[in-house]
Amino acid sequence: EDFEIVGFVFMTDVVRKNAPDILGYFEEQGVDLKVISGDDPVTVAAIAARAGLKDADKYKDATTIHTDEEMEDAILKYSVFGRVTPKQKQQMVRLLKQNGRTVAMTGDGVNDVLALKEADCSIAMAQGSDAAKNIANVVLLDSNFASMPHIVNQGRRVVNNIRTAASMFLIK
């Protein structure tokens, strides 16, 4: 009764201006993006929508997932996940791989290590934890997701060069 409101504090994650372009690039390339976070799913979905993620309104609270079957259904149906534990992140990566997907995982924290280790390609941010950087296949020195299209292009170039070289050996 004796309290007086003196102000409000508003905090938000800033979405970079180029985020919609980057997400658009991945959509054009046929890359299925998943946003997996330990944060509140409504908050994660709102940020994903501001960034321009297609189907950001399809989100799931991981605390409601209790069986492997529920997890498999969720990871194939939803694009955004909140309140995800490190073990669940690993399980999601494993299930995507079991469903024939090639999985690249980005992360920066200790909570991402299990999933990074499970992924086909793991990408850590240079400003992230040492644990994430040590387990990752690639470390983004600029800690900027905007570098990802360049990584995808380089990876595809390597794969194409290997195919070309292999076909020369098989033909001759």
Locate the predicted segments by residue.
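Basic, alpha-helical nucleic-acid-binding regions used in initiation and control of genome expression
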Residues: 116
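Membrane-embedded transport module
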Residues: 51, 55-105, 109, 119, ...
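Conserved actuator
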Residues: 37-44, 50, 125
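Conserved beta-strand/loop elements of the cytosolic catalytic core of P-type E1-E2 ATPases, chiefly
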Residues: 2-22, 27-42, 58-66, 78-87, ...
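A short acidic Gly-Thr/Ser loop motif
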Residues: 38, 109-110
